[in-house]
Amino acid sequence: LEGVRVLDLTRLLPGPFASLVLADLGAAVDKLEDPFPGDYLRQMPPSVDGQGSAWQALNRDKRSLVIDLKSPEGVETLRRIVPRYDVLIEGFRPGVLDRLGVGHAALRALHPGLIVCAITGYGQDGPLAKRAGHDINYLARAGVLGVTGPADQPPAVSGAQMADVAGLDAQRVQLGNGLAAAV
């Protein structure tokens, strides 16, 4: 993917992992973060040199950009830099970028050739679309979270994203076939 430029607006695991794969394949990836706290994985232990080791692993070979998308200046900066990129990956709940004035249609108006990838917990529409979705949410909905620790203590959060990984295998187990996905 040499010559392909990617702008990553995601946090935690799914988006940073997707952009890491693109970086490993040769794309130039710029990761955009809020001024503070940035990607929450930065603060998650274990850490090395004050940075979460998971964050370091998922964001190696990426250039960091700090832009406050909650400010008009930050949104204007995003509008200005979008034409430099071939791909934009975002992990906001549906409608968030629209409220900021930089939804998918607005981004494509700025750059008609832009590929926009939206990563959400529950899709772009439907009854759960506006909810945040993370591994812990999926474990709770599946009834698994209650067995991750002693009954008299809060659930133990797994170091690995069990629900995310289990979801990869669900179709094969249920239907007896694999899945081909093209990005």
Briefly describe each language-model feature range.
Residues 1-183:
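N-terminal helix-loop segment corresponding to the beta1-alpha1 unit
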